[in-house]
Amino acid sequence: MAHDRRRILHFGVTAHPTAEWTAQQLREAFPWETAPRYLLRDRDRIFGADFVKQVKAMGIKQVLSAPRSPWQRAYIERLIGSIRRECLDHIIVFGESSLHRTLTSYFAYYHGWRTHLSLAKDAPHARRIQATAEGEVAEIREVGGLHHHYERRAA
């Protein structure tokens, strides 16, 4: 997650995350030398030797949070809670591919329409301001109808 606009840069789905899998996700998230300067992370076991080696090879400086201190990673903890409350608590997932499709749909909604107080009630991908002209207001369903946004159609 990029902290500046709360953008999700990359996500992966697996039933059994390992250090090797996590290192591969890092390579996929930042190809062609686009890696960030810092990586904030906790002390979970999935960040093992392979992951640490990959981080160093990419020139990223790791910033570890204190043990048992989720408040030090407030943005990502909030995102995980939002995914659970706003999406996964309402959907039955039938495997990894189903979860990947659901999260792809949710992140499209999250980036384009979900408001964030810290962004002055804007979305991570800034929305255009709609004119107040005459016209019908149309409901557009997101995440399979779980969420909605509204647009004014031209008269």
What kind of region is each of these model predictions?
Residues 1-155:
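Charged DNA-binding/catalytic regions of mobile-element recombinases
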